[in-house]
A protein has these predicted regions:
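Alpha-helical, hydrophobic structural elements that either
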Residues: 18, 53-370
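Disordered, charged N-terminal biogenesis/targeting segments of membrane/secreted proteins
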Residues: 1-35
Length: 370
């Protein structure tokens, strides 16, 4: 049936509307899950702060890991933050060590650690300047409970999720980091962790080209029964990783925009990485930048999907971003009216045309051919 449906011709506009609707569904479901999980964790701090802490790396012995090599290539198209990560990945575990792990042999590596019967292996990394992406295998000797894989996926979303509890650097509270991927069986989960680093690369092209990323995991948890946060299974342990990510600055494209709206909101510039695009927005004095929402549309006027929940990074995966349109809207107006209102005019206007009459400030930017 799915193959037959894929053969039915549909317009690009309808195809894009369906994709945008599914992206919205994913975002709503993730927000609900985050609320449930944060309640269970006793209140969490900002996700982007929790992993940049100094750790001692203690290599551990590993059990047999059935799927560990080339994880980016296997799952980069199935998760919500899609990207060509395999084209830019830094391999942490060489093929020789991967073969040993898959054969059940002992590997002494800082990227493979076991605690309380759960092995965590970090096999690949890529750093875009806007985020760090880690390819991970998580293996439980005793098998994960059914709730981990039965409650964490739907046909609409198409991927599964595990959550990592990590200590927040300043407060000591736990924060939750989401790993998206799939369960290969009841014992093994493979996925990609995305950690936001917005601000590390600036619109003038300056920034951090290399990063030492520290990840300390105190517990691993999955999904529990709907509405029963206290029943979410949780595995405590100690997994500490230090990973270096290197960025080829030639992959970063920046454009100075300096567009100012009537209310004083300013689009300073655009930053485009191999995976995402981000607009630097500045609020006028006395106004809160958090009260506005930035939308970026591709060269065809279609809205780009958000790459993350915690920042306004937009995915460029398989989209034409040689030219983009940027719109800064009032947050409440966009969330309460504009986002839902587009469906009424979608047959007449692109998303860019629709937003042009509502934006506090907007700009059209063309990236020069490389």
């Amino acid at each position: 049936m799915r193959d037959l449906m894929n053969q039915v011709p549909v317009s690009d506009r309808l195809d894009r509307l369906v994709a945008d609707s599914l992206n919205q569904l994913r975002a709503e479901q993730k927000r609900k899950r985050r609320q449930k999980l944060f309640a269970a964790a006793g209140g969490a701090a900002a996700v982007f702060a929790c992993a940049f802490i100094f750790l001692n790396v203690n290599p551990a012995l590993a059990v047999r890991l059935p799927v560990i090599g080339e994880l980016f290539d296997k799952i980069e198209e199935t998760i919500s933050y899609k990207g060509d990560y395999s084209d830019h990945s830094n391999i942490l575990l060489p093929e020789k060590e991967i073969n040993k792990l898959e054969a059940g042999e002992i590997v002494d590596s800082p990227y493979v650690q076991i605690s309380n019967g759960i092995t965590v292996a970090v096999s690949e990394v890529t750093y875009s300047g806007q985020a760090v992406y880690l390819a991970m295998t998580i293996h439980n000797e005793a098998a994960f409970p059914k709730s981990f894989y039965e409650n964490s996926v739907s046909e609409e979303i198409g991927y599964q999720t595990l959550y990592l509890e990590c200590p927040e650097r300043n407060s000591g509270d736990s924060c939750l980091m989401r790993v998206e991927g799939c369960f290969k069986d009841e014992y093994t989960f493979i996925g990609i962790l995305r950690h936001d680093t917005t601000g590390f690369i600036r619109g003038d092209g300056s920034g951090v080209s290399g990063i030492n990323y520290f990840l300390k995991i105190d517990a691993i948890r999955g999904e529990g029964p709907e509405g029963e946060a206290a029943a979410i299974p949780r595995y405590e342990g100690e997994w500490n990783f230090k990973v270096h990510g290197e960025l080829d600055m030639n992959q970063i494209r920046t454009v100075k925009v300096d567009a100012v709206g009537v209310d004083g909101f300013r689009i300073k510039g655009l930053i485009r990485t191999p995976y995402e695009i981000y607009a630097e927005v500045e609020a006028p004095e006395g106004r809160d930048a958090k009260r506005c929402f930035t939308v970026i549309c591709d060269a065809n006027g279609n809205r780009l999907p958000l790459q993350a929940e915690t920042s306004e990074n937009y995915s460029t995966y398989q989209r034409d971003v040689s030219k983009v349109s940027v719109f800064v809207c009032d947050y409440e107006e966009y969330m309460g009216k504009l986002e839902q209102g587009y469906s009424a005019v979608s047959n007449e206007k692109t998303y860019a045309q629709y937003l042009s009459g509502y934006a506090l400030v907007s700009a059209e930017v063309t990236f020069e051919a490389e």
